[in-house]
Amino acid sequence: MIIGLTGGIGVGKSFIANCFKEFGAAVFDADFIVHQLYRVDKNIISYAEKNFPGAIANGEIDKTVLSKYFLDYDENWKQFQSLVHSAVQNELEIFIAQDKEINRKLLVLDVPLLLETRFHLYCDFIIFIYADSAAQAQRLSERNIDKEKLDLISSIQLPVKEKRQMSDFTIDTSTSKEHVLSQVKDIVDSLSLSS
């Protein structure tokens, strides 16, 4: 069974993915995959080198420099994003195939823009994760995401209401870690996945 996580930025999707690990889930962490691709994928590195001056350091993509180009969100960035999404999708398909061989009960996709990139089509269920505005603001502050970047990210995402409507379950991460874990356990139990 494959579960995808969705929600706004700074709501705790990666934390929820880690909670699922406690119940034996394998997690596909797209951010980790992208970090690896920025180090080794020759097509992605070459494209960045040609289109984003200064974004390559020691043969790898420098995420800090690259993030400045994100704010332009021009055709070069959209093409770059398409290359990255395609490479991540290839890695996801390998991950799913390998996991089928060992017959694991649960895979969790921690993929930013899960719905927008259509990665949700791999999922049996989708969980909408949310937090109250105070908790979300605190997390965004900890990640040094300023208003300009937040506004751009929000503009390329589906509206939160639509994400919620497309989801099968919801988890509120505004509460204690224990309560969040109990919400994850309730979902695992409802899907008869507990061991």
UniProtKB/Swiss-Prot annotation:
Its EC number is 2.7.1.24. The keyword Transferase applies. Its main location: cytoplasm. It is found in: Cytoplasm. It holds the Pfam family CoaE. One of its GO terms (biological process) is coenzyme A biosynthetic process. One of its GO terms (cellular component) is cytoplasm. One of its GO terms (molecular function) is ATP binding. InterPro entries: Depp_CoAkinase, P-loop_NTPase. Pathway: Cofactor biosynthesis; coenzyme A biosynthesis; CoA from (R)-pantothenate: step 5/5. ATP binds at residues 10-15. Keywords: ATP-binding, Coenzyme A biosynthesis, Cytoplasm, Kinase, Nucleotide-binding, Transferase. Residues 2-195 form the DPCK domain. It catalyses: 3'-dephospho-CoA + ATP = ADP + CoA + H(+). Belongs to the CoaE family. Catalyzes the phosphorylation of the 3'-hydroxyl group of dephosphocoenzyme A to form coenzyme A. This is Dephospho-CoA kinase.
